[in-house]
Design a protein with these regions (language model features):
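Glycine-rich SAM-binding Motif I of class I
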Residues: 69-73
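Aromatic-residue hotspot detector
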Residues: 38, 66, 91, 118-119
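Rossmann-like AdoMet
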Residues: 1-59, 76-110, 136
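S-adenosyl-L-methionine
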Residues: 100-140
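Conserved beta-strand/loop positions that form the S-adenosyl-L-methionine
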Residues: 62-64
Length: 140
């Protein structure tokens, strides 16, 4: 499948698929979109509304479409910061090539103690559970 790189308004990259006339993330900001929708309105909202007097320490996530790995990367960084164990399941029909992954600029756009974790998400084997960090397991 042919994909083109697009720089979004927040400076991050995303992909565009001409055959589908579809972007992987918002052209107004890939990182901003993922932070707002996946982290704040997703994970944080769930943790705030499903706590029963005790903070949740573990969460399972299913993502349909691993894509650029941005949602998984932000979730991983969130889990590390909040010390919450995430079991992350992701499906992907058209995985990115190594060359495409290297052209994404998330490691330079998102401050992280260990930006190499982004590469681990992408280089971990498919169809198996992968321990990416003590707080993040990936099954893709």
């Amino acid at each position: 499948m042919k994909r083109q790189f697009v720089h979004t308004e927040d400076g991050s990259t995303t992909l565009y698929v001409p055959a589908l006339n579809e972007h992987y993330h918002s052209i107004h900001g890939a990182i901003q979109e993922s932070l707002h929708i996946f982290i704040r309105a997703g994970i944080e909202f769930y943790l705030q509304t499903h706590s029963t007097g005790f903070p949740l320490s573990e969460l399972n996530i299913l993502e349909a479409g691993f894509g650029t790995g941005l949602n998984a990367y932000l979730s991983l960084l969130y889990a590390e910061k909040q010390k919450i164990r995430l079991q992350y399941h992701s499906l992907e029909k058209y995985p990115l090539t190594f060359e495409e992954i290297q052209q994404l600029n998330y490691k330079t756009q998102i401050p992280a103690k260990n930006p190499d974790l982004f590469d681990r998400l992408h280089t971990s084997p498919w169809e198996t559970e992968n321990l990416i960090s003590p707080f993040f397991r990936l099954d893709k």
